[in-house]
């Protein structure tokens, strides 16, 4: 299975993202420019649902129509509040908020006890972002909605972990949902992370006394490498500029704070039998270390695609990593059934310097035929409990190493169930330990 190189796409555009003119009409009886609390709340929700996409269009799978991001935000406000805001008003509001965020960030950076080089890098990073990116990055920390509750003691026993689906409304980890209009009006759902991998969300102001990065122990990150995004998807192209996309699983970029709790721990020995035990297996890798590089991700996969597949459907995987070091990484992905390796794909990726950090992207890597056939067969099972029974013995092990030194940088064990949520794919992350 050949390595798949990444080709850069156009970067996210500015806040103005034009679409059809259908919403540029009268403003009901609401004064133009007045953003009441209910409008502002709906605006913030929509920012979290629809990531910046430049001048590209988004297709709603249940309608098949193309929309610019700002028009989708305007539609969302109308549907939630009954009040009209045009896409141009949305664009203007985004720019006003972005200028405010820039001023706040500049004041905060200048007041910190940092050397001038660090201050300059932070300000340059901000300057390289569009208004839409700045506002969307900051909305991840908005205070409108508390985080959704996470299921507790999922791993209290091995059997409980493998057989118990989470309670409705408690599937952990937010994920992209492009069908917000079916949701109840209140309470609102937790904000959902952007899915585009072309920018890194604006980081919170770091603590001067911090000895480790804010993302370590709170995200999938070792001392050498951090996973920024991971997704497996099916895509159908409508024409050269538009496509419909369905996410089976997705880990979006996050913006952790030092106040966030560390990841829950799971004993790695609980899952040894789910992965190969021979040379290069999970047990041998963990004994080799380093221990802070090992993570478990439980996915609740979304198989409810409404997209017509057809012969031109593309099944792929994209992932993105970042590091303070420039190196060449090797990414091994092993698909396992009943603890035995079925197929393996090894890809090589090189560093790209972006905003003071080295970024590694594996973009639209084609799925192997085994995986595509597996998904097709799984979707045709009549009941979800049957799907989960099959998935109980299906796992994926991803191992990222330095190609030159062979050092283990990151190991992620993926396990799966089928999502029962109307909000699409969900996930929860654990760190693997050995007490």
Curated annotation (Swiss-Prot):
GO MF annotation terms: DNA-binding transcription factor activity; DNA-binding transcription factor activity, RNA polymerase II-specific; RNA polymerase II cis-regulatory region sequence-specific DNA binding; RNA polymerase II-specific DNA-binding transcription factor binding
Region Disordered, residue ranges: 1-34
Region (Transcriptional activation): 173-435
Biased composition range(s): Basic and acidic residues: 14-28
Domain of life of the native organism: Eukaryota
SMART domains xrefs: TEA
Gene Ontology biological process: asymmetric neuroblast division; embryonic organ development; female pregnancy; hippo signaling; positive regulation of transcription by RNA polymerase II; regulation of transcription by RNA polymerase II
List of residues that carry N-acetylalanine: 2
One Pfam family hit: TEA
Subcellular localization(s) per the UniProt record: Nucleus
Keywords associated with the record: Acetylation, Activator, DNA-binding, Nucleus, Phosphoprotein, Transcription, Transcription regulation
Record protein name field: Transcriptional enhancer factor TEF-5
Organism of derivation: Homo sapiens
